[in-house]
């Protein structure tokens, strides 16, 4: 083998070596992106719906004394906070921290509920009770570990775990309320038991529930998701 052939062979070996290194890099990158994509797809699978590009419905598996999995499904993404029972609410225009007591927390939650009601066109349901009372009841429905109660600020009104489970008919075998309207229905049923709703409002809720969410107490995501919101718009 002459010098030129040896040089050519060395060049080929070098190129092959470079290609192997490049292939390893690409393989590693592909593995990385494949894992990243799989992780993203898994996260996307956990986002069981969205409303107007703002409302995310993100499941959170929680262990409670009832032994159930509960799906947060409200206008914002909700995540369980620390052991103190904090609940974090993320809006499209910023991040709010909702705590279980204190005047500042009340202001935050009031702001959140005002935004919530504006987006869902539910202001009419506040005719005969304050937004603070509505806020406490609503947030109470999403607190499995303990009810959110503002007794010093809002009087003696509160909602308990038993109220929530009785209203939603959830049981220890893994049934849960997975939709915004269901959670509002829980609040609605609780308020009915406390005589907080007017008869005219009750009729509207009954109409919505009877037409839209007969099959909503089930595992997973229902195919009637869009129909639920369309039915709500007709009220």
Which residues does each PLM region occupy?
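Ribonuclease/tRNase effector modules and their secretory precursors
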Residues: 1-235
């Amino acid at each position: 083998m002459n010098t030129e052939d040896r040089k050519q062979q060395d060049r080929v070996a070098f190129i092959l070596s470079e290609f192997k290194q490049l292939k390893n890099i690409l393989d590693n990158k592909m593995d990385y992106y494949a894992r990243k994509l799989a992780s993203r797809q898994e996260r996307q699978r956990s986002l069981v719906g969205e409303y107007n590009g703002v409302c995310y419905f993100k499941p959170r598996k929680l262990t409670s004394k009832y032994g159930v999995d509960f799906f947060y499904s409200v206008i914002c993404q909700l995540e369980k906070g620390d052991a103190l029972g904090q609940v974090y609410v993320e809006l499209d225009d910023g991040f709010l921290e909702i705590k279980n007591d204190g005047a500042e927390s009340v202001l935050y939650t009031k702001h959140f509920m005002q935004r919530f009601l504006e987006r869902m066109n539910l202001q009419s349901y506040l005719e005969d009770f304050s937004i603070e009372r509505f806020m406490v009841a609503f947030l109470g429905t999403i607190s499995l570990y303990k009810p959110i109660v503002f007794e010093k600020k809002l009087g003696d009104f509160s909602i308990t775990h038993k109220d929530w489970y009785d209203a939603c008919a959830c049981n220890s075998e893994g049934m849960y309320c997975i939709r915004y309207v269901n959670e509002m229905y829980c609040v609605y049923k609780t308020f009915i038991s406390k005589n907080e709703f007017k008869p005219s409002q009750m009729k509207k809720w009954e109409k919505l529930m009877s037409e839209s969410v007969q099959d909503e107490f089930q595992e997973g995501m229902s195919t009637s998701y869009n129909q639920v919101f369309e039915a709500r718009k007709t009220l």
